[in-house]
Amino acid sequence: MPEFVRVAINESLWEFPDIYEFVRFLGGGSFGQVAKVRLRGTENYFAMKRLMRPFEREEDAKGTYREIRLLKHMNHRNVISLLNVFHPPAHNMMEFQQVYLVTHLMDADLHRYSRSKRMSDQEIRIILYQILRGLKYIHSAGVVHRDLKPCNIAVNGNSEVRILDFGLSRMCADKMTDHVGTMWYLAPEIIFLRGQYTKAIDVWSVGCILAELITDRVLFRGENYVSQIRCLINIMGTPTREFITGISMERSRNYLEGYPLRQRCDFHHLFMGYDVQAIDLMEKMLEMVPEKRITAAEAMLHPYLRDLIEPHHHAEDTAPVYDQNFENMVLPVKCWKELVSHEIRNFRPDQLDLHF
């Protein structure tokens, strides 16, 4: 049993096993704080995340359980995986107040990476293909990410990609009513509350990311909810009757039905000078009607990416179905703590292929 050490990091007291050495603070936010650590006696570096207030409220405790369960389930080279999870020694559930996650250390997120250099078309293709591989794997588990954006995609110097941040993820059939994620990458069915959200919302986000990678600018850059709608319609045109009839809120339907008619922009004109196959794939990802939108698996077979496919990818990109029945459970914090504690106790680092 390793000893725990206490280290003051960014005005917070961290407690972690002495097998790790603190290197430097990487950043943080409402989700938690992240530090770079080294496995003692080696040159192996990892990212250690200290969750912020993991058990403050019932929804926080449930979110902590969700994040651990999802990360434990994922085992793919293009998706962040859980390498270790622990909490400082606690004699009882009242003392159990902190949770730490250890994951792969990546050099930068895609937002910073894409702005630090001029990316070639080949590099864009390689990065996009890896995003789609990871997304296909996530979707095969029956999970929708819901918050794909450049800062939730990590990249190493060798263009290796991993999808991050499953804090908002849900099963496909979940009927969500909140607007999650950054507005600029939200699918129109989220903005207009159109029925049940499916895997298609993530594909829309990847289409927005592709547009940003090839042009170096955000495609739908709204300043607020109303301007986001205008940005969307200015490029995509007035939603069709097929799209509008699927909207559950009468107010949203009436708003769109009364909106001045506008034709969809010609993508080949809008993106003139860029790779025509990239534009064609982007159009298929940015289809307003989600039922007609290309899937991650189909996008990987598109001519823009087809030559990157390897025979073994199909098996590697398929995950076991993820059991998320707990999402329907309403429990007090104490019970969620016990479930989290059980997940931590039963985690075995060697259950993952750590040599990706």
Curated annotation (Swiss-Prot):
The modification Phosphothreonine is found at T177. Residues 20-305 form the Protein kinase domain. It catalyses: L-seryl-[protein] + ATP = O-phospho-L-seryl-[protein] + ADP + H(+); L-threonyl-[protein] + ATP = O-phospho-L-threonyl-[protein] + ADP + H(+). GO terms for molecular function: ATP binding; MAP kinase activity; protein serine kinase activity; protein serine/threonine kinase activity. ATP binds at L26, G27, G28, G29, S30, F31, G32, Q33, V34, K49. Keywords: ATP-binding, Kinase, Nucleotide-binding, Phosphoprotein, Serine/threonine-protein kinase, Transferase. CDD domains: STKc_p38. GO terms for cellular component: cytoplasm; nucleus. It is an enzyme of class 2 (transferase). One of its GO terms (biological process) is intracellular signal transduction. Kinase involved in a signal transduction pathway. Belongs to the protein kinase superfamily. CMGC Ser/Thr protein kinase family. MAP kinase subfamily. This is Putative mitogen-activated protein kinase 14C. It comes from Drosophila melanogaster.
